[in-house]
């Protein structure tokens, strides 16, 4: 699993991508010909302190590794994905994990409906 980097790729994702949301998370995804790439983002507007933003990003990356790794191996079309944290409080790891599972199941439904 690679990190989503580069202004053009991220811009393309937000302009043409689709999204799935489960508060406090939102997943924006776009089918692509390249490899699966994932990025995480936390709003500077909601979390002024870089320490808090980085803590949440760390939790998000762990959740991505735990829940998307199996899914990526099964997915035939490749995707660019961005996981956004839109909440206003620092989450507990267990709560984030539960919400992430729900978001992954909604993503699966949306992708399967597409095919």
Q: For each predicted feature, which ranges?
A:
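Positively charged, solvent-exposed patches that mediate nucleic-acid binding
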Residues: 1-115
């Amino acid at each position: 699993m690679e990190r989503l980097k580069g202004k053009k790729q991220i811009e393309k994702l937000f302009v043409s991508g689709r999204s799935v949301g489960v508060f406090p998370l939102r997943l924006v995804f776009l089918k692509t010909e390249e490899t699966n790439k994932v990025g995480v983002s936390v709003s500077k507007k909601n979390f002024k302190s870089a320490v808090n933003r980085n803590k949440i990003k760390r939790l998000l990356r762990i959740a991505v590794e735990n829940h998307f790794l199996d899914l990526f191996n099964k997915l035939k079309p490749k995707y660019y994905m961005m996981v956004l944290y839109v909440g206003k409080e620092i989450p507990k790891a267990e709560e984030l994990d539960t919400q992430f599972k729900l978001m992954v199941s909604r993503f699966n439904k949306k992708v399967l409906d597409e095919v």
